């Protein structure tokens, strides 16, 4: 049973948040939610990559105890600028320091929002420290799902999904399932299928003959969501939905027959759960990431997110389409990669990061992204993934192979 709005949060001390990826889209939305609830939450530590100016701005506004940047030179610049501004925030640098912040004894919640494989080790550090982890980093489950879920179970860390689709599924599940993320018995709880929705991106009606000519500017212009460049391209190829499919399989302990992917262009229904009695429970709302962020921060209570309420009278209609794998080969590849094993999903994810970067830099065509991903998965030797070092080894090898494939495409 869910607590009344604000009940649990009001009864507790102010929650300290470590925001991994504070300068990114999810990080900025998290800070917006904190701004709406200053009496309940404190930005204890902010972590970024190399965006010094934005980190300075965030530190001045939210006054965290710690700030960390992955890039050491950027961290030095940050320290100098904060000192000049008279701020006492302690500045740290590098992956080791970031992992230590994720596991800091004074941290109550960790928002895991670093994009890509770079977020893997800090997120794992938070789990190993038994933190409440608000999971927005898809790659953690895509690259080492079994290892990660096993660690969650072993450490009794609380895992709450932030991705709008997975959060919608989470909210549509019975309380017993919410308490068993990663190992809930769906059938025993009367659940028939997890229904994952996706907008289909900006090119769902574009003629396939035009796909070779799609530009980075067109690909990052998502029709519904405000997101970073990489995830916007992933949405356009539906690799984003493929990664979410893999993530959902791990989060909800779902078999292939318990998964359904459908295209819902309006992005109003964020995902659904089918029950064995014919009921379908869906979570709806305006497409704004502050809603799922606020839900995870307050769980099992509710807090103000700053999101405009859904106006049903403004809806022109809700439509649904079956995914077209010719239009979205990356989605098909992701489903097949999960069936092949953890090595394949790791290889695919690494290849995709390299391919998307190459596309954004105009080195390859939009349609080459899927070609690079498929070729890398084909070339990487099938192997057993037993530990994090195995994951990192496959990730590193796959990135090198992806770069070679890109060179061959340009030849």
From Swiss-Prot:
InterPro entries: DXP_reductoisomerase, DXP_reductoisomerase_C, DXP_reductoisomerase_N, DXPR_C, DXPR_C_sf, NAD(P)-bd_dom_sf. SUPFAM superfamilies: 1-deoxy-D-xylulose-5-phosphate reductoisomerase, C-terminal domain, Glyceraldehyde-3-phosphate dehydrogenase-like, C-terminal domain, NAD(P)-binding Rossmann-fold domains. Gene3D superfamilies: 1.10.1740.10, NAD(P)-binding Rossmann-like Domain (3.40.50.720). It catalyses: 2-C-methyl-D-erythritol 4-phosphate + NADP(+) = 1-deoxy-D-xylulose 5-phosphate + NADPH + H(+). Its EC number is 1.1.1.267. GO terms for molecular function: 1-deoxy-D-xylulose-5-phosphate reductoisomerase activity; manganese ion binding; NADPH binding. GO terms for biological process: isopentenyl diphosphate biosynthetic process, methylerythritol 4-phosphate pathway involved in terpenoid biosynthetic process. Mn(2+) binds at residues 163, 165, 244. 1-deoxy-D-xylulose 5-phosphate binds at residues 138, 164-165, 199, 222, 235, 240-241, 244. Pfam families: DXP_redisom_C (PF08436), DXP_reductoisom (PF02670), DXPR_C (PF13288). Its cofactor is Mg(2+); Mn(2+). NADPH binds at residues 23-26, 49-51, 137, 139, 228. It comes from the Bacteria. Keywords: Isoprene biosynthesis, Manganese, Metal-binding, NADP, Oxidoreductase. Pathway: Isoprenoid biosynthesis; isopentenyl diphosphate biosynthesis via DXP pathway; isopentenyl diphosphate from 1-deoxy-D-xylulose 5-phosphate: step 1/6. HAMAP family: DXP_reductoisom. NCBIfam families: Dxr (TIGR00243), PRK05447.1-1 (NF003938), PRK12464.1 (NF009114). Catalyzes the NADPH-dependent rearrangement and reduction of 1-deoxy-D-xylulose-5-phosphate (DXP) to 2-C-methyl-D-erythritol 4-phosphate (MEP). Belongs to the DXR family. This is 1-deoxy-D-xylulose 5-phosphate reductoisomerase. It comes from Mannheimia succiniciproducens (strain KCTC 0769BP / MBEL55E).
């Amino acid at each position: 049973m869910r607590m009344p709005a604000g009940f649990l949060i009001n009864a507790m001390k102010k929650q300290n948040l470590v925001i991994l990826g504070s300068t990114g889209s999810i990080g900025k939305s998290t800070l917006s939610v904190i701004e709406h609830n200053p009496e309940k939450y404190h930005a204890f530590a902010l972590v970024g990559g190399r965006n010094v100016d934005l980190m300075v701005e965030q530190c001045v506004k939210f006054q965290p105890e710690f700030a960390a940047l992955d890039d050491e030179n950027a961290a030095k610049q940050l320290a100098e600028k904060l000192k000049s501004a008279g701020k006492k925030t302690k500045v740290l640098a590098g992956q080791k320091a970031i992992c230590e912040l994720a596991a800091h004894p004074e941290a109550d919640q960790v928002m895991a929002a670093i994009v890509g494989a770079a977020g893997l080790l800090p997120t794992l550090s938070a789990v190993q420290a038994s933190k409440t982890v608000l999971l927005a980093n898809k790659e953690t489950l895509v690259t080492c799902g079994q290892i990660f879920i096993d660690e969650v179970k072993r450490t009794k860390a609380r895992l709450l999904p932030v991705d709008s689709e997975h959060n919608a599924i989470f909210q549509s599940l019975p309380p017993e399932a919410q308490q068993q993320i990663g190992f809930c018995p769906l059938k025993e709880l009367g659940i028939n299928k997890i229904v994952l929705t996706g907008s289909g991106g900006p090119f769902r009606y574009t003629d396939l003959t035009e796909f070779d000519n799609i530009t980075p500017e067109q690909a990052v212009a998502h029709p519904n969501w405000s997101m970073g460049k990489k995830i916007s391209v992933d949405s356009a190829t539906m690799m984003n939905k493929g990664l979410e499919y893999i993530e959902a399989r791990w989060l909800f302990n779902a078999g292939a027959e318990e998964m359904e992917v459908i295209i819902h262009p309006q992005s109003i229904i964020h995902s659904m759960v089918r029950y064995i009695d014919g009921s379908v429970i869906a979570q709806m709302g305006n497409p704004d990431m502050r809603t799922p962020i606020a839900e995870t921060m307050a769980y099992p209570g509710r807090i103000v997110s700053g999101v405009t309420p859904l106006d049903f009278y403004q809806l022109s209609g809700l439509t649904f389409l079956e995914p077209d794998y010719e239009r979205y080969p990356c989605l098909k590849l992701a489903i097949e990669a999960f069936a092949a094993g953890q090595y394949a999903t790791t290889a695919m994810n690494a290849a995709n990061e390299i391919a998307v970067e190459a596309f954004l830099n105009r080195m390859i065509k939009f349609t080459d992204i899927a070609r690079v991903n498929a070729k890398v998965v084909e070339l990487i030797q099938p192997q057993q993934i037993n530990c994090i070092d195995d994951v990192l080894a496959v990730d590193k090898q796959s990135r090198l192979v992806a770069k070679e494939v890109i060179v061959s495409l340009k030849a």
